């Protein structure tokens, strides 16, 4: 119990040292992740060379902007959207009939877990000091990249 309490206090100390302008240094944490640090190479290298242009009408773009809170007015955003659609169309063609379903990509790896027990952290105020805006001991996040004036309409 004392060992787990010391670990939680260690994380609280790291959180207390960080301020609004800096992020946590995850290399200081004691449990390294098994998730790859670098992205995997593109499974479809010829995807960018595909000139299969499916027209996307303005109503679809407006719907996607509203649902995803992402501004798609720039050419780069439309290019990324078209590339994502082409990638999704290619994934559909991959034969997966004889492939067993996975719950996670790390299914066969041993993960480092700790006992799920309640410990005394008592560092709520230290952690909440890192938030720019708080409300009733909760973090307040921005509503996305849509200005607040548009939300009232």
UniProtKB/Swiss-Prot annotation:
A Pfam family annotated for this UniProt entry: GatC
Localization per record: Mitochondrion
Keyword ATP-binding attributed: yes
Superkingdom of the source species: Eukaryota
Gene Ontology biological process terms in this record: glutaminyl-tRNAGln biosynthesis via transamidation; mitochondrial translation; regulation of translational fidelity
Uppermost EC category: ligase
Substrates-to-products reaction catalysed: L-glutamyl-tRNA(Gln) + L-glutamine + ATP + H2O = L-glutaminyl-tRNA(Gln) + L-glutamate + ADP + phosphate + H(+)
Keyword check for Coiled coil: no
Location of region: Disordered: 31-55
GO cellular component, one term: mitochondrion
HAMAP family xref list: GatC (MF_00122)
Assembly and oligomerization: Subunit of the heterotrimeric GatCAB amidotransferase (AdT) complex, composed of A, B and C subunits.
Other facts: This protein may be expected to contain an N-terminal transit peptide but none has been predicted.
Protein name: Glutamyl-tRNA(Gln) amidotransferase subunit C, mitochondrial
Biological source species: Drosophila willistoni
Phylogenetic placement of the source organism: Eukaryota, Metazoa, Ecdysozoa, Arthropoda, Hexapoda
């Amino acid at each position: 119990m004392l060992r787990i309490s010391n670990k939680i206090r260690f994380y609280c100390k790291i959180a207390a040292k960080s301020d609004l302008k800096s992020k946590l240094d995850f290399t200081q944490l004691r449990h390294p992740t098994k998730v790859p640090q670098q992205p995997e190479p593109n499974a479809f290298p010829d995807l960018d060379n595909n000139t299969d242009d499916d027209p996307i009408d303005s109503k679809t773009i407006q719907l996607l902007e509203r649902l995803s809170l992402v501004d798609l007015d720039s050419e780069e955003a439309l290019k990324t959207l078209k590339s994502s659609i082409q990638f999704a169309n290619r994934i559909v063609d991959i034969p997966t009939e004889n492939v067993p379903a996975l719950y996670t990509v790390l299914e066969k790896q041993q993960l480092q877990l700790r006992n799920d027990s309640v410990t005394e952290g008592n560092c709520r105020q230290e952690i909440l000091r890192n938030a720019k805006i708080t409300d009733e001991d909760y973090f307040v996040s921005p509503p996305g990249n849509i200005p607040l004036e548009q939300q009232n309409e």
